Amino acid sequence: MDFLRIDEDRKFMSRALELAVRGMGHTRPNPMVGAVLVKDGRIIGEGWHEVYGGPHAEVNCFAHVTEDPKGATLYVTLEPCSHYGKTPPCADLVVEKGVDRVVVAMEDPNPLVAGKGIRKLKEAGIFVTVGIMEEEARKLNEVFLKYITQHKPFVLYKAAMSLDGKTACHTGDSQWISCEDSREEVHVLRGCYKGIMVGAGTILADNPQLTARTEGMIDPVRIIVDGHLSVPLKAKVFHEEGENIILTTTASDEGKRKALSDMGVDIIMTDGEEKGSVDLEAAMTGLALKGIDSILLEGGATLAASAFDAGIVDKVRIYTAPMIIGGVSAPGLIGGEGAPTIPKAIRLRDVQTQMTGKDLVIEAYVEKEAKEEKAESTRPTDVDLLKREEEPCSQGS
């Protein structure tokens, strides 16, 4: 019987997760959330958080019910909120509608919620199950989770290379290593991240626009790492619509900083150990304070090396083209000194692969600390969570 319920719970939670994805790129800095209302094994209502500041998933779900929700089961990918923000508490609405049971994929780590919504439901006599498809829910909102708990942006390093690890020929020619399908996918990816980061070298070499160029997607904030302010004022990025932020140092020219500021460019100054080098770790805090919850890192080998050395990269997505470029002097993916020994190499986990057009795409998470990995491995299974389903708290407890 328990296994039958687990199958049913996973079925409807999967649907809720599918709905949540529809809010991608539109709800930040809030999470993507989906909700499904089920009665007698049938879906009678669906909804998702569509846009920041708009009705939450539960509200939209109840707004589209096809019959009386009393006695139904609500599946929601994130714990219902219990506080007044831009919208009233969703937990109160769930209680008001007479739902018998609520299945939650994961607790909300936001200190304003953090279990309070679940407790409110239990105190109202509602059965609550927490943790069904939690891993999938956490991955969906990985950006939100880091931003709300560590107050730093989630960083994805994206790059394209040949099969032998080259990002360009020895002449500098790199158009195009990745296939058209991959390039189109990258424009969609840009719209899913709040900021896009490159180094001064990329601006000087390619003079890119750094826009999403996909209908319906919001252009990212352009973040340029330039310790000496070597990028010219006439660069395309400074004359495109949208926001620009430059990460620089006190070694940069004060007059040029003022000129950029007069053009509407935000300046963040953080000095690294070497003169003219940007302290990327400190810069992440400054970017978070400006509302940057996520960054797509598209810089070259030098910036990539600095980012990995600073420990700011959370995830990688590498497009590998079926070609061999060769050449000792042809640039590779990561610059810098590199790992001195194999045990010191950066390790990746949860590796996934897929084909995008002719390119092999590898996506994985950067392994941070052993204690984080251990915490992940000890997370309870769906069966454990179902066995631990608690009785509702008594009224007034």
Feature locations, PLM:
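Generic structural signal for helix capping and beta-alpha/helix-loop junctions
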Residues: 111-112, 138, 304, 326
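Zn2+-dependent cytidine deaminase-like catalytic core
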Residues: 37-136, 221, 241, 245, ...
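Short capping loops/turns at secondary-structure boundaries
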Residues: 110-114, 130-133, 148-152, 175-179
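Enzymes that bind and transform nitrogen-containing heteroaromatic metabolites
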Residues: 2-23, 28-30, 46, 69, ...
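Helix-turn-helix
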Residues: 34
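Proteins enriched for Cys/Gly/acidic motifs involved in redox and nucleic-acid/cofactor modification
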Residues: 26-27, 54, 118, 132-160
